[in-house]
């Protein structure tokens, strides 16, 4: 029976996390309750772990018109059809934001409409684009982007943080890369968490 204890504990912690609210959901709910609709928000797109806020229809149209991928820009292209369906949806929410996506570099070849328009990791560029808030997750908050993080913390105010970890753990980045977009597997990562999701911080630019 003793050999079953580790597996049992792992299952217990996994089930406990699955029943808890994800930090991305917490972040989404906080933003919609505390940040005015129509505000300009830069979402950290250095990884696939950001809250799915709704883009304004105007920016969806503008993004598609500027989306220079001939394969999808043709009248019969799948992207064109998708955008038309999206914009004609009578249930498209009115409570939307001006969303830009933070990238380390902007590629003109491998682009996705769902991550457009883009903005570089540069504070001057963010101000030029009228960004009011930045939502950063644990990849951007790690030492890999130290230079930009220092600029961000100097030029903004931290207004809210959402952490999946128990108090006192003091960790930002997970122990395993698979935890960035899915559930953790290692026992330590499971037991250290209160909920699924990444560390997320909301900054208000000065």
Language-model features and meaning:
Residues 10-16, 23-206:
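C-terminal luminal/periplasmic domains and tails of membrane-associated envelope-modifying transferases
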């Amino acid at each position: 029976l003793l050999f079953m204890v580790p597996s049992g504990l792992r299952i217990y912690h996994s089930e406990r996390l699955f029943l808890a609210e994800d930090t991305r959901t917490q972040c989404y709910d906080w933003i919609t309750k505390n940040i005015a609709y129509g505000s300009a928000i830069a979402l950290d797109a250095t990884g696939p772990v950001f809250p799915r806020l709704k883009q304004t229809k105007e920016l969806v149209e503008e993004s598609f018109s500027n989306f220079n991928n001939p394969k999808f820009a043709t009248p019969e292209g799948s992207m064109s059809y998708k955008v038309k369906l999206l914009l004609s949806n009578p249930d498209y929410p009115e409570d939307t934001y001006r969303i830009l996506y933070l990238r380390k570099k902007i590629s003109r070849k491998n682009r996705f409409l769902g991550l457009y328009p883009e903005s570089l990791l540069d504070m001057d560029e963010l101000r030029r684009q009228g960004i009011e808030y930045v939502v950063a997750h644990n990849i951007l908050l790690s030492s890999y982007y130290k230079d930009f993080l220092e600029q961000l913390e100097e030029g903004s105010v931290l207004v809210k943080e959402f952490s999946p970890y128990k108090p006192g753990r003091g960790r930002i980045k997970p122990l395993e890369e698979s935890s960035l977009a899915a559930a953790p597997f290692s026992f330590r990562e499971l037991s250290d968490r209160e909920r699924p999701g990444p560390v997320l911080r909301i900054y208000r630019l000065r």
